[in-house]
C-alpha cells in the first residue's frame, strides 16, 4: 500500500519518525515514508529537509546528500538543541524523550493548504524556532 510505507522501527509508538521534503520547491521527497501506521498512529511525526542537504562528508569535505537519512540527522540535531535548552540551560530539568517529541510536533510549521495531521507530512515541517523554547 503506497500510503503505508513506514516500517520498523519508524512505525513504533514512542519513536520520532521524520519524513522528508525538498526545501527548494516545498514538495514532499518522493521516497519519503508515508503513514499512518496500520494501528492508526500518526507517522511520520513531521518532515525535515531531505533533498540536496549540505553537510559534512569524508576527508574534511562538505557534500550534498539526499534522503530521509539526511532528514533524520537534521531532526537529531534539533533534538540535541532542545535537550541543551531544557537540561543544560535548566529550562526544563526533568525533560523526557516524550517531551522533546511533543515540542517538535507542537512547533512544526503547518502550511495553510493542508490539513494536519496527514499521512505524508505528519504534523508539518520541522521548526525549532518556536515560542515555547524562547521563554
Question: Language-model segments: which ranges?
Answer:
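Caspase-like cysteine protease fold
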Residues: 114-135
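Extracellular S/T/G-rich loop segment that most often corresponds to the catalytic His/Ser-adjacent loop
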Residues: 2-80, 130
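Hydrolase catalytic cores
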Residues: 51-116
Amino acid at each position: 500500500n503506497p500510503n503505508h510505507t513506514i516500517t520498523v522501527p519508524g512505525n513504533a509508538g514512542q519513536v520520532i519518525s521524520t519524513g522528508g521534503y525538498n526545501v527548494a520547491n516545498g514538495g514532499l521527497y518522493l521516497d519519503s515514508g508515508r503513514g499512518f501506521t496500520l494501528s492508526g498512529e500518526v507517522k511520520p511525526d513531521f518532515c525535515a529537509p531531505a533533498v540536496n542537504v549540505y553537510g559534512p562528508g569524508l576527508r574534511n569535505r562538505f557534500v550534498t546528500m539526499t534522503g530521509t537519512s539526511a532528514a533524520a540527522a537534521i531532526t537529531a540535531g534539533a533534538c540535541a538543541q532542545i535537550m541543551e535548552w531544557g537540561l543544560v540551560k535548566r529550562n526544563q530539568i526533568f525533560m523526557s524523550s516524550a517531551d522533546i517529541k511533543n515540542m517538535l510536533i507542537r512547533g512544526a510549521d503547518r502550511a495553510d493548504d493542508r490539513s494536519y495531521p496527514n499521512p505524508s507530512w505528519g504534523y508539518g515541517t520541522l521548526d525549532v524556532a518556536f515560542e515555547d523554547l524562547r521563554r
